[in-house]
Amino acid sequence: MINPAGDAKNVGRKLVEGFERGVTLQFSEEIQKGLTDKYGHRVVLTRSPGEAVLPLQNASYANRSKADFFLSLHVYRQEEPKPKVIVYHLLYNPMVDLAQNNFNSFTFVPIHQAHFQNISRTVGFANNVKSVLNNGEFKKKLDFYGPYGLPFKPLVGIVAPSIAIEVGICEDNNWKHLVEPIVEGLNFLENL
């Protein structure tokens, strides 16, 4: 499942000519196509153009549909021509979040603890993205940062392994060069 930043009511950050909402939707559609072609998975976007998204709607959608993986995409404007890729995962307190937990499928889990169930898989997936994007081939095309564990609102309440990728670009079409590296960085999906 891919969550492009923004919606009908929230245009997101200002880019060179447009806004984050439109660029992330296009970016998400290309990544969706790349993942489907390369790994044969059914990839769902959390919103369509013109749709307004309520708080925690994406978390509810991902949990009800039992998504195998959740990716939140974000784009911001930067001055440097070399794109930056930053990976985040949800983490409130490393001592508590990363501790071993036993889960009963019949127990209510609060939204701020939903990520506990798959935190080790999430961290592993984020580190996989790091190892692929720090590869010599892709290192020339982009600067990679992370993965960083922090409270990140788009990932709150999601049980499935989930990461966010934020991309810094200097021109609105620079994201097109990043589709291949990101699809390659998500190569762990072929084993899901």
Task: Report each predicted region and the residues it spans.
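Active-site microenvironments of hydrolase-like enzyme catalytic domains
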Residues: N3-L15, A52-I119, Y148-A164
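Active-site histidine-acidic residue metal-binding/catalytic motifs
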Residues: M1-Y61
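Active-site-adjacent mobile loop/cap segments within catalytic or ligand-binding domains
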Residues: G18-R21, S72, Y76, N134-L192
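Catalytic cores of nucleophile-dependent amide-cleaving enzymes
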Residues: A114-G136
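Soluble non-cytosolic domains of exported or imported proteins
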Residues: G18-Q26, A52-L56, F116-G124, D172-E180
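Sec-exported extracytoplasmic/periplasmic mature domains
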Residues: E29-G40, N63-A67, V75, K130, ...
